[in-house]
């Protein structure tokens, strides 16, 4: 707190960091006049729950599934990033040359509103350690980095969590990222620059992240890599805050340029800039405490002729920065909570659906395994029944198997129609050829039955191979559909899936052969020219009635040109051909699909279901059949863990007072 003399005291529980977000006025202005207990009550109700909620979700590992609101701290090497974090947290963090931050550090600062003593905790991997003295933090962070990234200069994406609880810290959670390096030095990997940028981009790309860019005042802001990276992912500066450091190192005469940058007049960011003066190396050597450094910082800005205006505007000092960041984080969390809740709900439903595909764990007891296998096979058989009866569930952009088969049957009817729809001229030539070859002692005008019979047999024979081709096409479709059902039900059980697939193939070859035999038998029978008298007479009558209507226009005129008085029987033969073809078409277009449906859908499905039930008889194979893929177990375990995380996250969001 700043006392009436402008001095910062250690004893005040409010610390040097002033609350914002409706709980206090901006730093540098007078404190609000509400009673302290009212302020604490509002603080407990609004500020801490927001940050605790996100911290708890991050601790659950929810960030593995979706992005959480966060403030990421980035900066070039030697930008003063560590000094800023030290000033905010009140603890010494690793310092030195080269890459000091080698793992992302989640810095959780928790303000204690009473006189409780300082306490800290470092967590990483499966390790957790309580810290009772702030001086131990730097050592423990270095140990953690060495354990994760190895001793040296390598970096890692794995998080280290540092929790600091004290009356003298703001309520804030920051993610400290490695400093940006351009050239590998010492034993650093050759691509250390690429590795570092890749790690930083992983965080700053997320729309849920506020980017805190640390830039020294004594460099050209346009040349800093950190700001360039932030602008690349946030070109409008909507979620970027600039932090200017080392104002005491600015060359004389360039102070006004720094003020212009801080006042957002040079490189515009919607969230603007803050400026701070942290402990330098000389201060550390002189053992200047962080509290003393805060007082020195305030004195520096109050006494500086150029930078004093920034203090008056609330843009300067670490306490102002702390309040600003707390306010930004709370606002950002409240803004993103509805979307976060929606994303968690959607992910929960998606993972639940995915987990159902992997089924439940295989029981350990033998009798339970028997029932488990029965359930799996019954579910498979039920899906086969639904498929063969045209009642299976399909997605919005898919169609049922029976619909696909019906389309093939429709194509078959078009093939028949096309083969039988020869033009009159072509038929006349064909009839004339057969008349010249087979006509006996009949007088002109008498129909030669042999000619009629040969033409009909030949036309029907030409349909046999297309019918067999249709059989093979539909058989492949049914086999693929059965295999898909097998995969959907048994994919996690390699042996059961392989056994089922083998049965599907074996039954397919067997029934396809029988169906082809029946189809060829049908076409052999079609070589017997036969039709019920009454049926044929009706068909012939219809053809002749149609013929009479167009006799003057087409048939007679064409016949008079195509045939002489010697071949006056052509029109009669043509009419008989049309009449018989109508009835043959009805038989073939219906009977061939019936054969295919019977063998390739009905019998195929029934035989497969029976063979699957027979697997239950051999108890010795149950363990073998239910042997899971190792990746299936791992995937199911992973999905269950994700589901548990998201379920806890949903419960915590539901309890959040909002």
UniProtKB/Swiss-Prot annotation:
Q: Does the keyword GTP-binding apply?
A: yes
Q: Provide the residue span(s) of the region labelled Critical for lipid-binding.
A: 551-554
Residue sites binding GTP per the record: 75-82, 176-180, 245-248
Region named Stalk: 365-628
Q: Could you give a single Gene Ontology term from the biological process aspect?
A: defense response to virus
Q: Which GO MF terms are attached to this record? A: GTP binding; GTPase activity; microtubule binding
Pull one GO CC term from this UniProt entry.
Answer: presynapse
- Record's comment on post-translational modification: ISGylated.
Q: What gene is this protein a product of?
A: MX1
Residue numbers spanned by region Bundle signaling element (BSE): 339-364
In this UniProt entry, the residues modified to N-acetylmethionine are 1
Membrane association type: Peripheral membrane protein
Domain annotation text?
Answer: The C-terminal GTPase effector domain (GED) is involved in oligomerization and viral target recognition. The middle domain mediates self-assembly and oligomerization.
Output the superkingdom of the source species: Eukaryota
This entry's comment on induction and repression of expression is:
By type I and type III interferons.
Task: Give residue ranges for domain GED.
Answer: 570-658
Q: What is its main location?
A: cytoplasm
Organism in which the protein naturally occurs: Otaria byronia
Task: Give the protein's recorded name.
Answer: Interferon-induced GTP-binding protein Mx1
InterPro entries xref list: Dynamin, Dynamin_GTPase, Dynamin_GTPase_CS, Dynamin_N, Dynamin_stalk, G_DYNAMIN_dom, GED, GED_dom
Quaternary state and interactors:
Homooligomer. Oligomerizes into multimeric filamentous or ring-like structures by virtue of its stalk domain. Oligomerization is critical for GTPase activity, protein stability, and recognition of viral target structures. Interacts with TRPC1, TRPC3, TRPC4, TRPC5, TRPC6 and TRPC7. Interacts with HSPA5. Interacts with TUBB/TUBB5. Interacts with DDX39A and DDX39B.
Every copy of the Dynamin-type G domain together lies at 65-338
The annotated region (G3 motif) lies at: 176-179
């Amino acid at each position: 707190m700043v006392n009436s003399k402008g001095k910062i005291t250690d004893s005040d529980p409010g610390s040097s960091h002033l609350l914002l977000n409706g709980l206090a006025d901006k730093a540098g202005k007078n404190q609000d006049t509400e009673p302290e207990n009212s302020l604490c009550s509002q603080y407990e109700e609004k500020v801490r729950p927001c940050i605790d909620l996100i911290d708890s979700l991050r601790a659950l590992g929810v960030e593995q599934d979706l992005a959480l609101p966060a403030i990421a701290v980035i900066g070039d090497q030697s930008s003063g990033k560590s000094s800023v974090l030290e000033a905010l947290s009140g603890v010494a963090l690793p310092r030195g040359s080269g890459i000091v931050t080698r793992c992302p550090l989640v810095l959780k600062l928790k303000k204690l509103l009473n006189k409780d003593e300082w306490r800290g905790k470092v967590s990483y991997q499966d390790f957790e350690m309580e810290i009772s003295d702030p001086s131990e933090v730097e050592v423990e962070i270095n140990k953690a980095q060495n354990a994760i990234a190895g001793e040296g200069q390598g970096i890692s994406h794995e998080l280290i969590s540092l929790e600091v609880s004290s009356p003298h810290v703001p309520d804030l959670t920051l993610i400290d990222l490695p400093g940006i390096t351009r050239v590998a030095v010492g034993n650093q990997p050759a691509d250390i620059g690429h590795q570092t940028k890749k790690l930083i981009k992983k965080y700053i790309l997320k729309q849920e992240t506020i980017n805190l860019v640390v830039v020294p005042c004594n460099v050209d802001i346009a040349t800093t890599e950190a700001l360039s990276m932030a602008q690349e992912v946030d070109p409008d500066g909507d979620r970027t805050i600039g932090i200017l450091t080392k104002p005491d190192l600015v060359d004389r005469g360039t102070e006004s340029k720094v003020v212009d940058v801080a006042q957002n007049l040079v490189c515009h960011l919607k969230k603007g800039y803050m400026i701070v003066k942290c402990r330098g190396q000389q201060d550390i050597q002189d053992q200047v405490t962080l509290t003393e450094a805060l007082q020195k910082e305030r004195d520096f800005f109050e006494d500086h002729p150029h930078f004093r205006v920034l203090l008056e505007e609330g843009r300067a000092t670490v306490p102002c920065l702390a309040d600003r960041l707390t306010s930004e984080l709370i606002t950002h969390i409240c803004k993103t909570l509805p979307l976060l809740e929606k994303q968690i709900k959607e992910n929960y439903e998606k993972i639940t659906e995915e987990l159902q595909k992997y089924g439940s764990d295989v029981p350990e007891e033998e009798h339970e395994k028997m029932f488990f296998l029965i359930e799996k096979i019954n579910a498979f058989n039920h899906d086969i029944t639904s498929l063969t009866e045209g009642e299976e569930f399909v997605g919005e952009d898919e169609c049922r198997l029976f619909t696909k088969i019906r389309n093939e049957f429709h194509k078959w009817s078009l093939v028949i129609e096309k083969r039988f729809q020869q033009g009159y001229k072509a038929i006349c030539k064909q009839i004339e050829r057969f008349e010249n070859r087979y006509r006996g002692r009949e007088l002109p005008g008498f129909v030669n039955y042999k000619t009629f019979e040969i033409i009909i047999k030949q036309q029907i024979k030409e349909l046999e191979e297309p019918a067999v081709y249709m059989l093979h096409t539909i058989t492949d479709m049914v086999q693929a559909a059965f295999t898909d059902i097998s995969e959907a039900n048994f994919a996690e059980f390699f042996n059961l899936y392989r056994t089922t697939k083998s049965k599907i193939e074996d039954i397919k070859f067997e029934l396809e052969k029988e169906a082809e035999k029946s189809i060829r038998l049908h076409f052999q029978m079609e070589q017997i020219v036969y039709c019920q008298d009454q049926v044929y007479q009706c068909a012939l009558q219809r053809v002749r009635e149609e013929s009479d209507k167009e006799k003057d226009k087409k048939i007679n005129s064409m016949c008079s040109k195509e045939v002489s008085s010697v071949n006056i029987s052509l029109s009669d033969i043509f009419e008989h051909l049309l009449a018989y073809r109508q009835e043959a078409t009805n038989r073939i277009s219906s009977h061939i699909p019936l054969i295919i449906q019977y063998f390739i859908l009905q019998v195929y499905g029934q035989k497969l279901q029976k063979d699957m039930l027979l697997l239950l008889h051999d108890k010795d194979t149950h363990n073998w059949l239910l042997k899971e893929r190792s990746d299936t177990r791992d995937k199911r375990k992973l999905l269950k863990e994700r589901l548990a995380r998201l379920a806890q996250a949903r419960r915590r969001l539901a309890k959040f007072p909002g």
